[in-house]
Amino acid sequence: MDIRQVTETIAMIEEQNFDIRTITMGISLLDCIDPDINRAAEKIYQKITTKAANLVAVGDEIAAELGIPIVNKRVSVTPISLIGAATDATDYVVLAKALDKAAKEIGVDFIGGFSALVQKGYQKGDEILINSIPRALAETDKVCSSVNIGSTKSGINMTAVADMGRIIKETANLSDMGVAKLVVFANAVEDNPFMAGAFHGVGEADVIINVGVSGPGVVKRALEKVRGQSFDVVAETVKKTAFKITRIGQLVGQMASERLGVEFGIVDLSLAPTPAVGDSVARVLEEMGLETVGTHGTTAALALLNDQVKKGGVMACNQVGGLSGAFIPVSEDEGMIAAVQNGSLNLEKLEAMTAICSVGLDMIAIPEDTPAETIAAMIADEAAIGVINMKTTAVRIIPKGREGDMIEFGGLLGTAPVMKVNGASSVDFISRGGQIPAPIHSFKN
């Protein structure tokens, strides 16, 4: 590495808000299954506090050694619906509290995996877990929850979609922060290091380390140097920048896995913004020549960004996965917030952008009087985009306040303007229930 590369890396950290967003340890809880829910809770607590005992210390040590901020240390676990199903319990709040207690003991920021996978129907534990979500998130501080309601192979479970519309409303009524820690997925991935949707898939190793990076400020600074040049130059610039960002992510992941004595999983090739000025995905898109995010051309700019981030990242790291793309959460990106406030970005345009970005309608505040069926219909629309396009899509919606209000979450979750929602009813559509079949192109065997 020559001196120019060293100074580039220093500038990325000091001036362009580059950081490692998260080191996430995935832990299998399949060996914690017990017919007695209290014994299962104790086994869960013991395994997490044993396996992840040094996670925070190692993360801090690597950050100090490399001079690169590591913002979050997190844990993801096997979907709790699988663990709870072995018990006779009628709710799984006690398991959520065990996760929360373990997370506090080891000092991590969040723990994900209070989850269920119901893309093709409910098993015993799934329905119990879903109905436990509002209380579980209200009575814990660090637990994150996710439910997968569709996949390209299975179609969309519309009964679960309807249930999740209701659950989101109930969660919002029970606590201020609960809905910010609840994601509804289609095509959820098993190795996601990002919250709130992380869970540890049953096909993963017993314990692994996954890394998520963050570098929209770095990409924007690189694009500032090629203003007015062709899209060929823009694409190459983004690709080379993504390579550098991902290379550092791989280094951190390998160091963490070696020191913790566990397998290295993946680097998630995602550009994750924060509310800080200079750390915005929206501003990267505007640097390509858009007056403001939300105007015509936004989706095309996002397509270029997303694809080149993947191309550069794949070259830099031989183990990539997770969600891998540009995140467009409204509350966590100062450029997105500004675009909503000036009227150039609405829900419909955000939905179009989710056909390309790494997740979906993320951290979006809507009026608190929005019916559960309308929320369910938003989930169905997002799931349809994911299922048809063979990509992960998700909804993390915040029904709080009235249109035009600003909802404060603080920290990385930021501030969300309450957006206008189409007032026409979707009740008859959602009340049908059943399954939307898998698309024809999913049949590949």
Swiss-Prot record:
InterPro entries: UPF0210 (IPR007841). Pfam families: DUF711. It comes from the Bacteria. Belongs to the UPF0210 family. Homodimer. This is UPF0210 protein SPP_0289. It comes from Streptococcus pneumoniae (strain P1031).
